[in-house]
C-alpha cells in the first residue's frame, strides 16, 4: 500500500467564545492543510501506477474545502455570540462558513477528514492542519 500527500494553504477567521485566553477574540490564521491518501496503484488506464492523480486530489480539495472556507469567518452555529457576528458579517456581504461545533484546530481537522472521506469517498488516511507554522493537529481513524 502507498501513501501520498498534498499540502494546501488557506486563510480563515474565527473566535473561541468562552476561551480563557486571546482566542476568545476574533482573529485569523493562515492554515496549512496536509491531506494524506492511502491505497494501491491503479493497474491500468490513464491513472496507471498512481494512487490518485495529484491534480484530481487538488480539484476535490479546492471544491469541497478551499472554495467554501478560504477567507471566510468560520463559526459555531450553536453559539449565540458567534452566530450574531456571522449574521452581521453576512449583512455586510462578507463570507461566512457555519459548522455545528467549536472551531478549534482539532474539530476543523476532523470535519475536513469526514468531508473528504465520507462525502467525496476518498481513502483518506490522515489530515494534518497547521493553525500556526509551529502548531498542528492530526486526525485519523
From Swiss-Prot:
The keyword Zinc applies. The active site is at residues 23, 71, 131. It catalyses: 7,8-dihydroneopterin 3'-triphosphate + H2O = 6-carboxy-5,6,7,8-tetrahydropterin + triphosphate + acetaldehyde + 2 H(+). GO terms for molecular function: 6-carboxytetrahydropterin synthase activity; metal ion binding. Pfam families: PTPS. Keywords: Lyase, Metal-binding, Queuosine biosynthesis, Zinc. GO terms for biological process: queuosine biosynthetic process. Pathway: Purine metabolism; 7-cyano-7-deazaguanine biosynthesis. Binds 1 zinc ion per subunit. The keyword Metal-binding applies. Its EC number is 4.1.2.50. Zn(2+) binds at residues 14, 27, 29. Its cofactor is Zn(2+). PANTHER family: 6-PYRUVOYL TETRAHYDROBIOPTERIN SYNTHASE, PYRUVOYL TETRAHYDROBIOPTERIN SYNTHASE. Belongs to the PTPS family. QueD subfamily. Catalyzes the conversion of 7,8-dihydroneopterin triphosphate (H2NTP) to 6-carboxy-5,6,7,8-tetrahydropterin (CPH4) and acetaldehyde. The active site is at the interface between 2 subunits. The proton acceptor Cys is on one subunit, and the charge relay system is on the other subunit. This is 6-carboxy-5,6,7,8-tetrahydropterin synthase. It comes from Haemophilus influenzae (strain ATCC 51907 / DSM 11121 / KW20 / Rd). The lineage of its organism: Bacteria, Pseudomonadati, Pseudomonadota, Gammaproteobacteria, Pasteurellales.
